[in-house]
Amino acid sequence: MTRIDVIDNHGQFTHLEQRALRDMGVDVSLRDNTTPPEEIDADGIVLSGGPDMDDIGNCPEYLDLDVPVLGICLGMQLIADELGGRVGGGEYGGYADVTVDILDDDDPLLGSLYPETRVWASHADEVKEVPPGFERTATSDVCGVEAMSNTDEAIYGVQWHPEVAHTEEGEEVFENFLSVCDQQSVARQ
């Protein structure tokens, strides 16, 4: 069975990320972002959202664990920041029901949602420039980089919240991430 660790960056929806995966039958644990990297033993990691880029604990070190990573909201921003992208304030802050245009129908995480999906967004900051090796895989009228992927490293990010009921195809995002984790697990054996 696929094992996923959800890393708690103290976001308002983190418990919903854990619950969504648990309800899908996944062996999932919620781990504080101060957990030492050597204690992480999972087939994949979800970096949760959170309120503060200055309170990301050991998240940068988790990016080196050679397992697939899905960053959600702040989780995506910290991936971009740590790996050479650029994060800044968004022009539109707050909560919103947003139509997101999926740019790559072959993307392992979001391709199945092509050409667009409705999502729930809740953020003030956003990725302004993706890191080297990443592709922008989704955009919207309110955020230029709604998602990004580095398929070679199996590191993905979405600016919105797939764990929230208002996101129409959120469970599919998690299902696609689980598929990536399963494929990577087989490849490592």
UniProtKB/Swiss-Prot annotation:
GO molecular function term, any single one: GMP synthase activity
Q: Does the keyword ATP-binding apply?
A: yes
Instruction: State the GO CC annotations.
Output: cytosol
Q: Active site at which residues?
A: 73 (nucleophile), 161, 163
Highest taxon, organism lineage:
Archaea
Give the quaternary structure. Heterodimer composed of a glutamine amidotransferase subunit (A) and a GMP-binding subunit (B).
Describe its function.
Catalyzes the synthesis of GMP from XMP.
The entry's protein name is GMP synthase [glutamine-hydrolyzing] subunit A
Organism the protein comes from: Haloarcula marismortui (strain ATCC 43049 / DSM 3752 / JCM 8966 / VKM B-1809) (Halobacterium marismortui)
